[in-house]
């Protein structure tokens, strides 16, 4: 027994040694291949990063020139460089896939994933189709930027000028004409957009995604469907507050305009909410606010009273950031930014923030109107600039926000500190209203911030379904209004058909700017604000807190900003809030006194809420 066992054992050992030697040789060969491939991947990442950094400066400059001087020549130059940039991006994204399963360090793995997933409009590998996509993209941008509506009296107005009428007029007929008139500029976009979707979907498939919807949703450090579920969860948290606000506003508009213009039930006609897209309702504040809720001041009027011109408005927004410990903006910012709509040429007036050299050449481009709304928008745009500068020491691929919602949230977080107390500190307001005026201030904020939430969500709900084929081109407009009614409870004021292309009247659709970031930003800003107020030691109601002048809060914020995109967004979120989960409860906490008041008003008026 023992002998047999020993012989078998020896034989087994010999076989094992023999097999082991073979396995060792194979393992060594595989190991050497892996090491070689890993070194190759690291070189690829470094080269890709250098290429993209150089190209980004080139495309930033060409797009800046095009946006500020819209001509056929600048459009051609922009399209040419955009084509080159997109082609390089797609090539690098495609090449990066071969390194996906290698044992790389976390930073390199992250860079590879970002290279592959961060192309918003991926061109097909076919060079002719790449050229076609670049030209379509430039043409869509131009149609929006040059868009004007001409009245019968010969006046031709741009989008900002038309938006000013939407904000100020209370004449339903005039509002309807402007609402309808601006949407005429979008009709020619429809076939271009349809073709753009075909080409970009092909580009997404070349990168290994099912379609552009899957690509867009893959940039959030979680699986695309898990991200969609996260959005549903956050919307579910805030929907009761939105429903209360919608019910109240609809009832007040009905009392003002009557049943034929503003029905007491069903969706609200979209031209009556003070905004070209009914995305924020702050301009109807005067129509819906109760008399005793008036805070006693109007920021637009205060800006005029204190002789704020466009530059002074920007200077004041900058001073908020410097009060937190951030360095002032460079001289070149003031020399190179566009603040006022030129009289001699077409420009893209939509507000945007620019980082031209990935270091210090920061700018904003907007046609500033001297209003409370634009005062807030300026804070928002500077938030982008201060974020851009904070992460300038990161490697190029990480020079971005933790997720795109973070970039949109930072300036708005600062703007939440534009409280009466802050306005008094900077000399705009003489006296701070007492707490009895809080309802008016909260209602104004809710009309801007809470009213926006379903709009911020639905634009990409529509686009994702378009990209995936769930919405076909024959259904573009009907599906748009179905979603607007489902989420926002608003409707088109006149019959629309598939000859119309109402999504194209919103800049971000022809401009190919993803929109879910704005929904996330409207959740995150309240979460950031609440946490920064706690860091600043403010123990009062969160809606009365201003972090202006608090260096400790500024330092905490800067820690997160400097991380850029180098870590998954939950880690960046934790740097300020102490938690890795987005939570809309901060929105409910901020507006808690208002929701109680809204529900009381709706109950007293016996309103039937919902639509």
Tell me what each language-model feature is.
Residues 231-241, 401-438:
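Post-HExxH zinc-binding segment in Zn-dependent metallohydrolases
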Residues 373-389, 408-412, 462:
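Active-site recognition of the HExxH zinc-binding catalytic motif
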Residues 2-12:
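Bacterial N-terminal signal peptides that target proteins for export
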Residues 26-195, 213, 506, 513, ...:
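N-terminal helix-rich structural modules
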Residues 25-41, 72-74, 113-115, 211, ...:
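C-terminal, non-catalytic "cap/extension" segments appended to globular domains
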Residues 20-23:
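C-terminal motif of bacterial Sec signal peptides marking the signal peptidase cleavage site
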Residues 213-214, 218, 388-413, 427:
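Post-HEXXH active-site segment of zinc metalloproteases
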Residues 154-158, 195-365, 435-445, 451:
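Active-site-proximal, well-structured secondary-structure segments within enzyme catalytic domains
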